């Protein structure tokens, strides 16, 4: 019985129970919303960015990590270099992909990460690495590897460092005590050695965009980092995930109402490869935001993923049947690229 039916039956039900019932009905049917409206979907227009998740293990535990990375979370296993290279070669053969994104967890914890990083660069891709720039990246052999790769590939490589606020206080609210100085140390080292950097912040601090960018601009100026705060690729401000999200589902009518296009969504131009703990092979997912929901597995190759049909897919198109699709991408305007 849905929440409207409970009311019609004249039952006295607490408001919080009605809210819970309504929430449970959302994002259930791949094709229809809880209100019976046709669910929106997004087709892959061109595989511009291929994300490779290197594993969910991380050196720290953040307050609100969308993928729940931590020193103990290994739900996504370490991708091996051989597995990653298989997808790099397939992406190269498809002749569409321009960028490889590596994410985790913390990519520099993966013992084979430098091998796969070199393989991506050697195949001519631009490469974006999402990192916290802390101790895993600052180990001597990792620094030596980064210096060698930067010397060979230069502007192909960018490390985007998570700096959740431009103040130590709020950054450490999210990341924990003693994370600020080590992160700044990592960014300073990258900048001093001419390695491409970008910054990823958050929008959960009740600041408008201009205020946030001005705050980061002041910090960037003090350190002399080569980052342009007004450039939304160089300073990315990400909306929050919310497990209890109770906002609207996205219907086919929403594109016109919101003045947005399916082409603007991350899944119109990207896919992510993950390897689940205990799995024999990696699988392809629509994007970086759906790491654990097996209903969104599209196949074991990029070619299979392009033909995924049934359930959450329609001949490769992705049905927006997840709260992260609504809150982060469509309504939040977020993108990991």
For the regions a protein language model found, what residue spans apply to each?
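Accessory C-terminal segments flanking Radical SAM cores
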Residues: 221, 239-337
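Conserved C-terminal portion of the radical SAM core fold
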Residues: 95-101, 153-163, 178-247
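Conserved alpha-helical substructure of the radical SAM core
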Residues: 10-103, 108-118, 123-126
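Short, flexible loop/turn motifs enriched in small residues
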Residues: 58, 154-155, 265
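Intrinsic disorder/low-complexity detector
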Residues: 2, 18, 26, 297, ...
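Intrinsically disordered, serine/threonine/proline
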Residues: 1-13
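Canonical radical SAM enzyme core domain
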Residues: 72-86, 107-151, 159, 163-185, ...
């Amino acid at each position: 019985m849905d929440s409207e039916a409970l009311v019609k039956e004249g039952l006295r039900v607490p408001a919080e129970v009605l809210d819970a019932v309504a929430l449970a009905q959302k994002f259930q049917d791949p094709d229809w919303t809880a209100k019976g409206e046709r669910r929106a979907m997004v087709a892959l227009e061109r595989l511009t960015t291929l994300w490779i998740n290197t594993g969910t293990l991380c050196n720290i535990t953040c307050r609100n990590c969308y993928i729940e990375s931590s020193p103990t979370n290994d739900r996504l296993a370490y991708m091996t270099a051989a597995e990653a290279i298989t997808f790099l070669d397939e992406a190269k053969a498809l002749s569409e992909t321009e960028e490889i994104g590596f994410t985790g967890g913390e990519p520099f914890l993966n013992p084979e990460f430098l091998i796969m990083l070199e393989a991506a660069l050697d195949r001519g891709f631009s490469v974006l690495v999402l990192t916290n720039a802390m101790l895993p990246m600052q180990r001597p052999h990792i620094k030596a590897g980064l210096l060698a790769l930067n010397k060979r590939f230069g502007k192909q490589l960018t490390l985007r460092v998570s700096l959740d606020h431009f103040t130590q206080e709020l950054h450490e609210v999210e990341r924990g005590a003693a994370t600020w100085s080590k992160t700044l140390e990592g960014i300073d080292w990258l900048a001093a050695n001419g390695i491409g950097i970008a910054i990823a912040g958050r929008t959960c601090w009740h600041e408008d965009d201009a205020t946030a960018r001005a705050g980061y601009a002041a910090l960037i100026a003090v350190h002399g980092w080569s980052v342009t705060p007004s450039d939304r690729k160089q300073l990315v401000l990400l909306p929050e995930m919310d497990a209890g999200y109770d906002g609207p589902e996205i219907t086919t009518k929403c594109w016109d109402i919101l003045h947005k296009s399916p082409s603007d969504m991350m899944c119109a131009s990207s896919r992510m490869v993950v390897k689940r703990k205990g799995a024999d092979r990696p699988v392809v997912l629509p994007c970086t935001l759906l790491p654990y929901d097996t209903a969104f597995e599209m196949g074991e190759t990029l070619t299979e993923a392009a033909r995924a049909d049934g359930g959450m897919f329609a001949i490769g198109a992705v049905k927006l049947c997840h709260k992260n699709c609504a809150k982060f991408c469509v309504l939040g305007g977020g993108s990991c690229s």
